[in-house]
């Protein structure tokens, strides 16, 4: 798959369970070990590249999760463009929205942090706590 200037090899564990995708940037692969494990396309689970592309930000690996955040920046349309699975759940004010999106991995955290004070994560609680810790660590760099 091609994304953000690079080609990626996307793989799932060979047990047939598509729990989460693993991403490998093709230009960084140095060695491949061939195992004597054969498979046919009939044995592989269905894979929707388009859906994976919509849910993956910056090709960060990880499980699928639903996130909700408040956005008060200048362009909610830019958010909807960047996150193809995003939808406006509620309008909270003249320029404030509650947005929900499904994403794989922690790429969403990196993107949310890049949105400055325009974003407040409200769900899931684990991501809320991760954001608090990251913002506290960032602030400590300036003290």
Regions found by a protein language model. Give the residues of each.
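Core beta-strand-centered patch of the WYL/Sm-like small regulatory domain
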Residues: 1-59, 63-68
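Polybasic (Lys/Arg-rich)
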Residues: 52-143
């Amino acid at each position: 798959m091609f994304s953000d200037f690079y080609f990626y090899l996307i793989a799932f564990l060979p047990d047939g369970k598509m729990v989460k995708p693993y991403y490998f940037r093709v230009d960084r692969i140095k060695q491949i070990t061939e195992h004597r494990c054969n498979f046919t396309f009939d044995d592989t689970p269905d894979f929707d590249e388009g859906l994976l592309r919509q849910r993956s930000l910056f090709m960060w690996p990880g499980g699928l999760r639903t996130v909700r955040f408040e956005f008060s920046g200048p362009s909610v349309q830019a958010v909807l463009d960047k996150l193809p699975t995003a939808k406006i759940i509620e309008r909270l004010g003249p320029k404030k929205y509650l947005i929900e999106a499904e994403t794989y991995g922690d790429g969403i955290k990196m993107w949310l942090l890049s949105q400055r004070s325009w974003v407040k994560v409200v769900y899931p609680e684990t991501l809320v706590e991760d954001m608090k810790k990251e913002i506290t660590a960032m602030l400590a760099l300036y003290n």
